[in-house]
Swiss-Prot record:
Residues 21-96 are annotated as: Disordered. The keyword Cytoplasm applies. InterPro entries: Cell_div_SepF (IPR023052), Cell_div_SepF/SepF-rel (IPR007561), SepF-like_sf (IPR038594). Homodimer. Interacts with FtsZ. Belongs to the SepF family. It comes from Streptococcus mutans serotype c (strain ATCC 700610 / UA159). This is Cell division protein SepF. Residues 25-56 have a biased composition (Low complexity). One of its GO terms (cellular component) is cytoplasm. The keyword Iron-sulfur does not apply. Keywords: Cell cycle, Cell division, Cytoplasm, Septation. One of its GO terms (biological process) is division septum assembly.
């Protein structure tokens, strides 16, 4: 029975027939959570005031652990730091756009390597099976979040992956769609 459930879960992961379901009950539950969060936020304010009073006198252990933590954090670059470093670079660099037609999942690593080198990548999944294209797109989207990149859908099976220093004017794409929904979508169904 457990094996059967495992297969059903795997199959349902790839199933896209239920994509158009409306999530109205979720909106109602969010409103209830917001109403319940208002009295809780007043309690949190009182607790945070008490915490700040006790935290104003750090102990010797807290000071030492903070120093150890800072030495380890020197090697870690946060996302805002990466963005600032890209904004400070001179604009004389030329941006290149690579066109990739992945045929297997392993090609996604090559696409991410191009993003690491600050190159734009236009990806067309027309030569991949739908399931492989979804997995590849998941990997690329995750890598773009980590590397502060941007992934936008520009066609039925085409996506544009850009580094942080490239701005894409998506306004023209929405005008060309003539009322069609062009929001980001992982579904690669071809009609």
């Amino acid at each position: 029975m457990a094996l059967r459930d495992s297969f059903n879960k795997i199959i349902s992961y790839f199933d896209t027939d239920e994509v158009s379901e409306v999530e109205e009950p979720a909106v109602a539950s969010v409103k209830r959570q917001q109403d319940a969060a208002q009295p809780a936020s007043q309690q949190q304010k009182a607790q945070s005031h008490q915490y700040h009073q006790s935290a104003s006198r750090p102990s010797q252990q807290q000071v030492q652990s903070g120093q150890n933590r800072r030495s380890g954090e020197e090697n870690i670059h946060s996302l805002p730091t990466r963005r600032q470093s890209h904004n400070q670079q001179p604009a004389q660099e030329k941006t290149t756009i690579a066109l990739k037609l992945p045929r297997k999942y392993e090609d996604a690593e090559e696409i991410v390597d191009l993003l690491i080198r600050n190159e734009c990548v236009l990806i067309d999944f027309q030569y991949m099976l739908e399931a492989q294209a979804r997995r590849c797109l998941d990997f690329i989207d995750g890598a773009s979040k980590v590397l502060a990149g941007n992934l936008q859908k520009v066609g039925a099976s085409m996506y544009l992956l850009t580094p942080i220093n490239v701005i894409v004017d998506a306004e023209e794409m929405t005008l060309a769609a003539n009322g069609q929904d062009v929001s980001f979508n992982y579904d690669m169904k071809r009609r």
